[in-house]
Amino acid sequence: MRPWVLLRHFGIAFDETLIRLGQPDTKAKILDVTPSGKVPCLVTDAGDAVWESLAIMETLAELHPQHAMWPRDAAARARARSISAEMHAGFADLRQNMPMQIATHAPGIGATPAALFDIARIDAIWTDCLAQSDGPFLFGDFCIADAMYAPVVMRFNSYEPALSETSRAYANRMTQLPAVTAWIDDARKESAR
């Protein structure tokens, strides 16, 4: 989801190869593209495979420097990278207890103490970033940090945990972002197959 949303938001053309998960040949198809055996994976025009969302988006920022995929300000960029890395490496309890399922609407399900701890930390990150940037996104304009938290927004839409007013408004803005709505529409179509 993350690199897809970033590419769409910045209007960068790409070819998508859909590999259905949970099929007998899924792993083999993925291994044909990336040695990690995981998705997503970006294959550059030079034929190089880049996997892991954050590495993909760093590569995209390098390949397309005309787009401010990271904040231009050095201090803001460092903070954006920090919260992106925290998202990449953390929040395991949220991921485990509130899996991302676009079609799910299950308020309150998965609200374990550990998941709620993760949610409180995310709420604090968003609130702090939005206060410092004056929004509408975490660092003013949409950037990689916002893309990193897009799957969390989907979880919050499904499970509806209690959030601050600031974070709920941010989640709503993210959900309404054209690139995110396009991803949701495609995900729903794919789920219906």
Model regions and ranges:
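GST-like domain detector, emphasizing the conserved glutathione-binding G-site
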Residues: 1-110
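A local structural micro-motif
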Residues: 15, 38, 164, 182-183
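Active-site-flanking alpha-helical
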Residues: 61, 152-153, 184
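Residue-level signal for well-ordered alpha-helical positions
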Residues: 63, 83, 159, 186-187
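Short, hydrophobic secondary-structure boundary micro-motifs
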Residues: 67-72, 95-97, 135-139, 181-186
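GST-like fold's C-terminal all-alpha helical module
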Residues: 87-176
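Long hydrophobic alpha-helical segments typical of transmembrane helices together
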Residues: 166-193
